[in-house]
Structure formats: C-alpha cells, structure tokens
Amino acid sequence: MSHQTGIRANEQLAKVFGKAKNGKFRVIKVSIENEQLSCGATAETKKDWERDYDKLIGPLLEKDVPCYILYRLDAKIPLGYSWLLISWTPDTASIRQKMVYASTKATLKTEFGSAYITEELHATTLDECTLEGYRRHKQDFAAPAPLTSREEELKELRKTEVHTEINTNTRHQTLGGINCPLSEATVAAVQDLVRGKHDYLQFRIDLEEEQIHVSRAAKVELADLPKQVPEDHARYHLFLFRHTHEGDYFESYVFVYSMPGYSCSVRERMMYSSCKAPFLDELAALGVEVVKKLEIDSGSELTEAFLQDELHPKKILHRPAFAKPKGPPNRGAKRLTRPTAED
C-alpha cells in the first residue's frame, strides 16, 4: 500500500499550475522546500515536444538532488494537453529524500490534476531522463509483464492438461492444512503490528500443544532481519517491508516460512508445512494483507535486493537462446554408405 505525506503546493506553485493548463509552459520543475511543493523553474514551448525535450529538461536536473519534472507533450486530451511526470530520484540521494519524494508524488498529481498526467517516468540516472531514455521506457512499458515461476508452471500445465468429464459419481481427493489455534498473546501481537507498534513478528508452533505462539515482537531494521532467523528450528516470520519502487513508497507485509534444511525433525517440518495456509487465513482475518509469501532455508537470503526482486519482478524483454547440447564424446567416426551400382 502506498502512503502520502502532508506536504502541499505553496501559493506560487498553485498559480503556475493554473497557467500551465493553457499550454504556455513546456516544462515545470517542482521541488520540496520547507515542507512545501515549490516551483523550481519553468520554460515555455519553443519547438515540438521531441526537440524541446533534452534542451529543456537536462539543465533542470541536479546530479544528487531529487525533483519532479512536469513536461507537456503535444498530444491533446479532452481537458487540454497531456503531460508527462518525471520523478527524478538519483541513487546518490539520501534515503530520507527518496522516501519523502516517493510519498509526496500522489499529492503532486492531485494538486496539478491527475487527469492531465497521461504518462509517468521514474528515473535514477541522468541517461534515463533523456529523450532516448524516455523512448526505452515506453518500449519496456509496452512489453508484457513477466511471469513468476509458479505462473510459468501453471501455463505449461494448462497446455498439457486433460479435460475430464465431471459427474455425480466423480470422486475428488483433497488434502487440507492443519488449523493450529493462536495463543492470546499471538493475537494481541498481530493487532499491535497492524496498529504500528511493531514491524516484525516471529512465530513458533508448540508441537505438544499444537498451538501457534509469538516468540518475538519488535521493531527490526532490514539489515538485522537475517539475524532473526534461527538455524536449528523452523519459524514463521511477518515483516513490514518499507521501501520505494519507481518513485512510489510502499509498506508491504511479507510472510516468511523459514525451514533450515533437515536439521529439524520430520514432525516439525510436517507441522509447519501443514499449518502455514490456515495461519495465513488467520492473519488475513486479523487485518494483515500479506503481499508476498516466501520460503527460505537461511536468513542470509533476506536482503533488500531479494525482497525487491520478489515484490517487483524485473521485466525480461528477451529470453536467452539455449545452445544445442553437445553429443556424446565417444560417438565414433561417421559411417558413410555408398550406393550399389546397378548392372
């Protein structure tokens, strides 16, 4: 879910936005100064939008300082001209700046008029802010979304599945999970998590009682998350992952099921595996919207890059072609056959 700050446009910027609707301006630079959205610069239309693009946008960008760029295109919509919103957030900017700009983008769109903004571009390098970078973005955006490994499996399964006639005599075999009850402390900890008191919870299953208990509730930094995963026992983990992606700020609940290989007993592995789905249903009933479910062997897997890739898979525009496998090494020389001469 995306969150907003209380930052609003100042009076000067509001006036600029009003004048922009008549097509006078080609570009408007917006910065956050003194907890307000402020007008950093404007430039009027000179030629067509493509020839103006690099000449007008490039000089407005500072290497280490984020900003928003509103760029007027030449295409018309019922309200007037369509606009491109560029969120310039360089990698060298501070984390606080990245968070503030990501959280304020929705407010900027509302202040300017969301209906006028027909395209958006999130840029972290100066190259992405060029006309060529914009064209690459358009090409990438038009590509189909990548499939997860699970979706790929389902796609292949549908190609080969056999359609069977179903009638009243058809029998179905199902295997449901084990619904382990939650302790009172566990329910209270989840409710505190939803209220914002914690951002990390760890749960264990009491194998004798067959009940789920909370074993840790705390505010944990992402860098310390791997240390929370035990090396000798299975656990469930619930983490509120605060991050930015393409200029937007997200707070996403990530559920992690950690199972450290075969160091656990067979019963422990079976209990954690069987209780997982019903436990997730219980979390949903308590108001926790789990965005991603993960299974890991070791806490070292829980890095920011790993979580970003899991929540926001990167598009793969071209699949690599696999080389033809080599034949057996001792295949022998080729055998030639000569046609028999006919008398």
From Swiss-Prot:
The record, for InterPro entries, names:
ADF-H, ADF-H/Gelsolin-like_dom_sf, Twinfilin
Q: Which domain of life is it from?
A: Eukaryota
Positions of region (Disordered): 319-343
Q: Keywords of this protein's UniProt record, alphabetized?
A: Actin-binding, Cytoplasm, Cytoskeleton, Repeat
* Compartment list: Cytoplasm, Cytoskeleton; Cytoplasm, Cell cortex
Q: Tell me the ranges covered by the ADF-H domain, including all copies.
A: 11-135, 184-312
Q: Name one GO biological process term.
A: regulation of actin filament polymerization
What cellular component GO annotations does this protein have? actin filament; cell cortex; cytoplasm; myofibril; plasma membrane; presynapse
Recall the GO molecular function terms of this protein's record.
Answer: actin binding; actin filament binding; actin monomer binding
Chief localisation class:
cytoplasm
Give the similarity note: Belongs to the actin-binding proteins ADF family. Twinfilin subfamily.
What is its biological role?
A: Actin-binding protein involved in motile and morphological processes. Inhibits actin polymerization, likely by sequestering G-actin.
**Subunit notes for this chain?**
Interacts with G-actin; ADP-actin form.
Q: What is this protein called?
A: Twinfilin
- Native organism is Drosophila melanogaster (Fruit fly)
Taxonomic lineage is:
Eukaryota, Metazoa, Ecdysozoa, Arthropoda, Hexapoda
